[in-house]
């Protein structure tokens, strides 16, 4: 069975195609993505109207490329992200998916974007046992308890203010480094000293919420450090600031993720979201999981950011388990919860 997935929740227009065999195994046939990231760069963040227009312009070319890569004229099913995400962006992708499904005469499946990140993190793993997922991106920082791919997940904790990826973007802008901040800071951090500056780690005390995150204090601390240096006429090491900031973020993320695994008795930790491509996060997560006897499952780098493969993969897994097709009338939901069915 060939399943095509469309992703358009933010600034990437993604179409992925997977092949599902009778045993439930998946093979990636196509991964086509167009990003409007550079159009948002001068604004320092994603502009919803620009993102929606970019999806409209990119959808047909990206679809054609995905079908070319897959070597198929049409799939056996079409799936699309219906939430959470930007309202206009979601409408473009979901509407396109419904139109293609109707034109091809194949079933349509509505997919939860966050569930897609979990599914792709386990794409090359074996059957998923009880697990914890750490989803980290520009819009989300969450710890989720996962019993099976595609089923409703339980939120253990989330950010109380800025998402981790959002903190990266704000610190990058503060340092005049550009957008998006994640890859830029990660690259510079490799040349810096992560112990040069003692930036704070939010909500790490035992009395704090065990599974929640806070990065606003860290962001403010970086701003004050830079302002003080400028006021005193000191030249700062941007590399050291980046390394120390990144170490603080990754320290908190990995510490709390491993603690969540211990608290719920999970033996597998899944990483997902754009920040899961961060080199230090992957490295520190592996170190701490190894020490704790926890298996770490991380997607390929190209599947960490938003893509259509993760949507196709989640839909395919649920189809294999007997999921019914979605009504064509199903709407989009910008605030869709992870605690709802992941395909509906």
UniProtKB/Swiss-Prot annotation:
Residues that coordinate or bind Fe cation: 113, 117, 306
Biased composition (Polar residues): 326-344
Protein name from the UniProt record: tRNA N6-adenosine threonylcarbamoyltransferase
This protein's record includes keyword Cell inner membrane: no
Listed Pfam families: TsaD (PF00814)
Function: Required for the formation of a threonylcarbamoyl group on adenosine at position 37 (t(6)A37) in tRNAs that read codons beginning with adenine. Is involved in the transfer of the threonylcarbamoyl moiety of threonylcarbamoyl-AMP (TC-AMP) to the N6 group of A37, together with TsaE and TsaB. TsaD likely plays a direct catalytic role in this reaction.
Gene name of the record: tsaD
Main subcellular location of this protein, as a coarse class: cytoplasm
CDD domains in alphabetical order: ASKHA_NBD_TsaD_bac
Catalytic reaction annotation: L-threonylcarbamoyladenylate + adenosine(37) in tRNA = N(6)-L-threonylcarbamoyladenosine(37) in tRNA + AMP + H(+)
Binding site residues for substrate: 135-139, 169, 182, 186, 278
Family, similarity comment: Belongs to the KAE1 / TsaD family.
Subcellular location: Cytoplasm
E.C. designation(s): 2.3.1.234
Gene Ontology biological-process entries: tRNA threonylcarbamoyladenosine modification
């Amino acid at each position: 069975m060939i399943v095509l997935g469309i992703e358009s929740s933010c600034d990437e227009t993604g179409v992925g195609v997977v092949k599902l065999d009778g045993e439930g195994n998946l093979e990636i046939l196509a991964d086509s993505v167009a990003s409007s990231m550079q159009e948002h760069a001068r604004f320092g963040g994603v502009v919803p109207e620009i993102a929606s227009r970019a999806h409209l312009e990119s959808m047909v070319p990206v679809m054609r490329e995905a079908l070319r890569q897959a070597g198929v004229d049409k799939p056996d099913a079409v799936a699309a992200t219906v939430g959470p995400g930007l309202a206009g962006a979601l409408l473009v992708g979901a509407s396109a998916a419904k139109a293609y499904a109707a034109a091809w005469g194949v079933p349509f499946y509505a997919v939860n974007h966050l569930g897609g990140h979990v599914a792709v993190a386990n794409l090359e793993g074996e059957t998923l046992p009880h697990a914890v997922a750490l989803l980290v991106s520009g819009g989300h920082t969450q710890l989720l308890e996962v019993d099976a791919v595609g089923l409703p997940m339980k939120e253990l904790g989330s950010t109380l203010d800025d998402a981790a990826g959002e903190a990266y973007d704000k610190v990058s802008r503060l340092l005049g480094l550009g957008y998006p901040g994640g890859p830029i800071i990660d690259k510079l951090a490799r040349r810096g000293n992560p112990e040069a500056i003692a930036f704070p780690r939010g909500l790490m005390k035992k009395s704090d919420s065990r599974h929640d995150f806070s990065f606003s204090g860290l962001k403010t601390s970086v701003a004050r450090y830079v302002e003080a240096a400028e006021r005193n006429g000191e030249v700062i090491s941007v590399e050291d600031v980046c390394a120390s900031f990144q170490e603080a973020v990754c320290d908190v993320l990995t510490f709390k993720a491993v603690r969540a695994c211990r608290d719920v008795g999970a033996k597998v930790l899944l990483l997902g979201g754009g920040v899961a491509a961060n080199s230090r996060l992957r490295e520190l997560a592996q170190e701490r999981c190894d020490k704790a006897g926890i298996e770490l499952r991380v997607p390929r780098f190209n599947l960490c950011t938003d893509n259509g493969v993760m949507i196709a993969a989640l839909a395919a897994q649920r189809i294999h388990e007997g999921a019914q097709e979605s009504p064509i009338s199903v709407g989009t939901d910008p605030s869709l919860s992870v605690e709802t069915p992941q395909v509906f």
